[in-house]
Amino acid sequence: KKSSITFTNEEGEQEEEDLVYNRTDFWTTSSNKQLNFVQHINTLLNARGKAAVVVPDNVLFEGGAGETVRRKLLETTDLHTILRLPTGIFYKPGVKANVIFFDKRPAGPERQTKEVWVYDFRTNIHFTLKQHPMTDADLEDFICCFHPENRHQRHETWSEDNPDGRWRKFAVQEILD
């Protein structure tokens, strides 16, 4: 059975051999566990399923198979939001992570993602699990900006006049170029 909503964080700490998965339902073959995890989540969603997936930065910036996975996500899903997480909350210290939010759409001739909203919760922010843990209150601004069901109500807080604003919209072509 396909899922309508998935929120998940891939366990990145396990030591295991590099395996290359050659699945016909994946967009590309890779030994990168995080890229395979994103592809796997996509296969679990029903035609209108929604996902929020915690991924390390390399999923957003890696070339080769990483670029293929990103392009396919932009083409076949509405990858509408990226939440750039501060260091020290999910992974070992120094590893940079994000939450990517995407909605699966039925296949069509046009690219499904038109724009991507990015909330920079990383710049000048740091948490630790024990001494300075993140709380619900720390996410209030993101939640106010997010509007998951009414994205037309979103408004950027970043501008050239307000470079400290954390909420910014990018046209998908800006990301692809």
Q: Each predicted region: which residue ranges?
A:
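A conserved structural/catalytic subdomain of Rossmann-like adenosyl-cofactor enzymes
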Residues: 1-177
